[in-house]
Amino acid sequence: MSYQQQQCKQPCQPPPVCPPKKCPEPCPHPQCPEPCPPPKCPEPCPEPCPPPSYQQKCPPVQPPPPCQQKCPPKSK
């Protein structure tokens, strides 16, 4: 006997009793959400990158030393 034939010999089961169909309930009115929370302050900006190291090594520019040589007075 094949599997299908065995299935055929089993007594039929009564169809399940479906519950009576309910009309779908109308959608409830959308409720206003809670008031918006105050906007979060953005994270503080990250510190700007330090200047590249080669800029830090430069000595500050100094004015040239005053001339030691005494110039002769200009003739008019």
Curated annotation (Swiss-Prot):
Which parts of the sequence are annotated with region: 3 X 9 AA approximate tandem repeats? Answer: 21-47
Region spans: Disordered: 52-76
Q: Which tissue types show expression of this protein?
A: Expressed in uterus.
GO BP: any one term: epidermis development
Asked if Repeat is a keyword of the record, the answer is yes
One Pfam family named in its UniProt record: SPRR2
The sequence repeats are at 21-29, 30-38, 39-47
**What InterPro entries does the database record attribute to this sequence?**
SPRR2 (IPR029142)
Write out the annotated subcellular location.
Cytoplasm
Recount the UniProt induction comment for this entry. Answer: Up-regulated by estrogen in the uterus of ovariectomized animals, with strongly increased expression detected in luminal epithelial cells at 6 and 12 hours after hormone injection.
Keyword Ribosomal protein part of the UniProt annotation: no
Instruction: Show the GO cellular component annotation of the record.
Output: cornified envelope; cytoplasm
UniProt keyword terms in alphabetical order: Cytoplasm, Keratinization, Repeat
Indicate the family of this protein. Belongs to the cornifin (SPRR) family.
Q: What does this protein do?
A: Cross-linked envelope protein of keratinocytes. It is a keratinocyte protein that first appears in the cell cytosol, but ultimately becomes cross-linked to membrane proteins by transglutaminase. All that results in the formation of an insoluble envelope beneath the plasma membrane.
Q: What is this protein called?
A: Small proline-rich protein 2E
Source organism phylogeny: Eukaryota, Metazoa, Chordata, Craniata, Vertebrata
Q: Which gene encodes it?
A: Sprr2e
